[in-house]
């Protein structure tokens, strides 16, 4: 009898696991690097704004909110890309393409995730709540950009970095110049690393009429990325000077230079697999810079 109950419980768990698995994949729960690429810049901002470890509730709200909004962004991105994803090698097995998740359920999932995230934001001050409305607009409009402009990666930077001014607003009640410098650095970084991802899909995107910085930059892609990364690091130097950060921050920037250089080495032939590795490698760049900021602001 006990064995039968145990077997029934396992069967039920497997049933729900199989039912929920497509939704987990739709939210990119199986691919945490995207979450981390959004997390690190927000943590940069939280630690800089607080001058050290931020208040625990603010840290919890932003960390959870990042996961929720990133997941929601992936859902709405796949919903709007239903015309494109079946024709792109990297995306043709996504749940909306295979029919594992219906478009209606995807929209319900997006709305649910955003409502939970907004509920968390409501525990912050008024300025943070107002800024979150802009963040919602950026998240909802980004997926449509690849139809109309070659710069969706720049717009992704605007959306991915919006947690930076929100973090300063939540802790300081204002968004100082330092926050906007950090925001600009993140836009440059996001544009650079997402261009690696766009290079993976470039041939398929050209066939389908989609647009990206990889298509715009063409043979100059590596050169322009080098410029973007250089400008990002220069802007981060301005952030460090303005915040009078200690030597650990500057050491982290030197380490970031080495990590970025490695990306160009592995992707120098523009092979799709190598370009995707370079994209994923940016997680280490973000983590290294965060470590430098955290150590530099520890008293």
Swiss-Prot record:
Pfam family, one: UbiA
Keyword rRNA-binding: no
Any one GO BP annotation for this protein: ubiquinone biosynthetic process
EC code(s) of this entry: 2.5.1.39
Gene3D superfamilies, per database record: UbiA prenyltransferase
GO CC annotation terms, alphabetical: plasma membrane
Membrane topology listed for this record: Multi-pass membrane protein
Cross-referenced InterPro entries: HB_polyprenyltransferase-like, Prenyltransferase, UbiA_prenyltransferase, UbiA_prenylTrfase_CS, UbiA_sf
Enzyme class: transferase
Protein name: 4-hydroxybenzoate octaprenyltransferase
UniProt source species: Xylella fastidiosa (strain 9a5c)
Gene that this polypeptide is encoded by: ubiA
